[in-house]
Amino acid sequence: MTESVTVAELVKANRLDVYTGKDNLDRKITTSDISRPGLELTGYFNYYPAKRVQLLGITETSFAKGMSHKELLNVMRKMCQPETPAFVISTQLDPPEELTQSAEEAGIPILGTKLTTSRVLSNMTNFLEGKLAERQSVHGVLVDIYGVGVMITGDSGVGKSETALELVKRGHRLIADDRVEVYQQDEQTLVGAAPAILSHLLEIRGIGIIDVMNLFGAGAVRSETDIDLIVHLELWQDDNHFDRLGNNSETQRFFDVVVPKISIPVKTGRNLAIIIEAAAMNFRARSMGYDATKVFDDNLKRLIKQNANKS
């Protein structure tokens, strides 16, 4: 979990313009919440979230234009607290002179963007939530297969990295090998990424470390992806009764998100890459409303009923 993000990182990720305070972009942002000061402009500061990035749009700036210079300067100075990381002005609006004066006095950057207020609010919130979210490190491999984020787990040496290499060779994209940094982006979305030091790398026993981006090109890698499906690889054991029809619904919980999970037995001669590829396509088909197991079950019940009527 990252405890803070600098204003410079926010500027770079969201392509913001720096109006003032270029020397103060190292200020820390410690919360993903964004504040749109409304009541504060009227002078109400009983609850002012000073630690948040302050976002001003058309509504706020037009209201400010109706205030006297003295009133607005007083309000802006109250808004420029030592813990306030930055001000952001949307829709290519000019910041009020009183804000510029107050922010320069406090050493707080003023940033700008051509995006609408709602759009920049969404973009900044998503970025900050991703950066500041609690993270869990998982032993596994994460691959994007036909747009489905598949996290492959299993004991060490079961063949996760080798399977990922075959999937990359078949045109899919690697996100992480060995360690997957997992975090919750929102109520229903789980995201996985690689630790910076392991980005784009695969470790293959007998070969060593290979750079997937260097060998297969930029189209073979991604920096992060949603985790839609977990595939757990297990060594084949005759006394293990693996699901053959797809009726069993396994899941695994990370934070507040429950992710579908399937277990695949590993045995000599089984092409795991093709099996996992098929699992991803089957998951996507189910997400679109087609369930082959249900179709088979319905056909079987209909056949049994027909045979029963004949007898």
Swiss-Prot record:
Cofactor needs: Mg(2+)
Start and end residues of each stretch annotated as Important for the catalytic mechanism of both phosphorylation and dephosphorylation: 202-211
The enzyme's E.C. designation: 2.7.11.-, 2.7.4.-
EC category: transferase
Keyword Kinase (UniProt): yes
Region of interest (Important for the catalytic mechanism of dephosphorylation), ranges: 265-270
Domain of life: Bacteria
Keyword Nucleotide-binding: yes
Catalytic residues identified in the record: 139, 160, 178, 244
GO BP annotations listed: regulation of carbohydrate metabolic process
Pfam families linked: Hpr_kinase_C, Hpr_kinase_N
List of residues binding ATP: 154-161
An MF annotation (GO) of this entry: protein serine/threonine/tyrosine kinase activity
Function: Catalyzes the ATP- as well as the pyrophosphate-dependent phosphorylation of a specific serine residue in HPr, a phosphocarrier protein of the phosphoenolpyruvate-dependent sugar phosphotransferase system (PTS). HprK/P also catalyzes the pyrophosphate-producing, inorganic phosphate-dependent dephosphorylation (phosphorolysis) of seryl-phosphorylated HPr (P-Ser-HPr).
Family per record: Belongs to the HPrK/P family.
Further comment found in the protein's record: Both phosphorylation and phosphorolysis are carried out by the same active site and suggest a common mechanism for both reactions.
Subunit text: Homohexamer.
Entry's free-text remark on domains: The Walker A ATP-binding motif also binds Pi and PPi.
Identification of the protein by name: HPr kinase/phosphorylase
